[in-house]
């Protein structure tokens, strides 16, 4: 048969190997491609013959993905999504630095100031040395988000950009979040998990953010697109319920409306100017704001 991946004619794999180490999926593994009921099949074909993939291609993608998922340096968990990332040259230093920048993951042997300096250099197109590896901002970089769905896996997103391109988008996200913080707040920047926690009732038994929210927010950050409305709705719901505006919630409001303003490229009367500022404006006459 004709392989949909390689475009070559050859033997087709009937059942693809399982993908393991995805949070929330079966411990024995889950399938990325599977057809296990007649309702999913067409033209009399059975199982994965409905999506013909050559034996070599099926072996290659499952082996490579299982290898990456087994290496904790390439894998990050955010909400219900398992995120795996890698550089084209396969050097793990790219994934390690990306994890520190995007998820606030610990970066051994480097301080937060060191990390910010390296990210700034890469964003400006200058290579940096990280753990004896020279990181090229023009290196192709890939980010894959997977979520469990019973015995199957769902691809939440598969993103490709240069390493420097991803970092520039992440830095733009942090710039939008910038806001005056109280003296007791030790977070220089707000990691993604902390933003998502602002949408959750901290007194509830389940403190997980809404399904799909983590993946949608991460995709918006990495692609430099508008934040999902569900993030804004989740934060405003907690503000109304708890009558408290934390630094994180104020930062989400500011970032959401600033990105909205950037996207529509014109003045929007629905966006109060005060919301876009870094600090509180006590002299405003905007009643909802005050």
Regions found by a protein language model. Give the residues of each.
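Short Cys/His-rich metal-coordination motifs, predominantly Zn2+-binding knuckles/fingers
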Residues: 6
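Extended alpha-helical scaffolding segments
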Residues: 10-290
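The −1 position to Zn-ligating cysteines in a subset of zinc-ribbon hairpins
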Residues: 2
């Amino acid at each position: 048969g004709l392989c949909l991946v390689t475009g070559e004619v050859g033997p087709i794999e009937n059942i693809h190997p399982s993908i393991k180490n995805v949070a929330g999926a079966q411990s024995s593994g889950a399938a990325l491609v599977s057809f296990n009921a007649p309702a999913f099949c067409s033209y009399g074909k059975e199982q994965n013959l409905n999506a013909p993939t050559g034996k070599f291609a099926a072996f290659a993608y499952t082996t490579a993905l299982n290898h990456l998922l087994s290496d904790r340096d390439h894998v990050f968990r955010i909400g219900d999504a398992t995120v795996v990332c890698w550089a084209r040259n396969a050097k793990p230093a790219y994934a390690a630095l990306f994890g520190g920048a995007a998820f606030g993951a610990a970066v051994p042997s480097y301080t937060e100031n060191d990390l910010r300096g390296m990210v700034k250099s890469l964003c400006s197109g200058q290579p940096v040395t990280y753990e004896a590896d020279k990181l090229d901002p023009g290196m192709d970089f890939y980010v894959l988000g997977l979520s469990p769905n019973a015995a199957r896996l769902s691809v939440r997103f598969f993103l490709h950009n240069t390493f420097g391109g991803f970092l520039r988008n992440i830095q733009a996200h942090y710039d939008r979040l910038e806001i005056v913080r109280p003296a007791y707040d030790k977070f220089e920047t707000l990691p993604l998990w902390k933003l998502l926690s602002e949408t959750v009732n901290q007194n509830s038994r389940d403190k997980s953010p809404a399904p799909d929210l983590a993946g949608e927010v991460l995709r918006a950050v990495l692609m430099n697109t508008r934040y999902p409305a569900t993030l804004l709705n989740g934060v405003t719901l907690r503000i109304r319920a708890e009558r408290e505006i934390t630094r994180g919630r104020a930062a989400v409001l500011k970032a959401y409306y600033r990105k909205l303003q950037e996207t529509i490229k014109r003045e929007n009367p629905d966006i109060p100017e005060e919301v876009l500022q870094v600090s509180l404006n006590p002299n405003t006459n905007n009643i909802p704001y005050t």
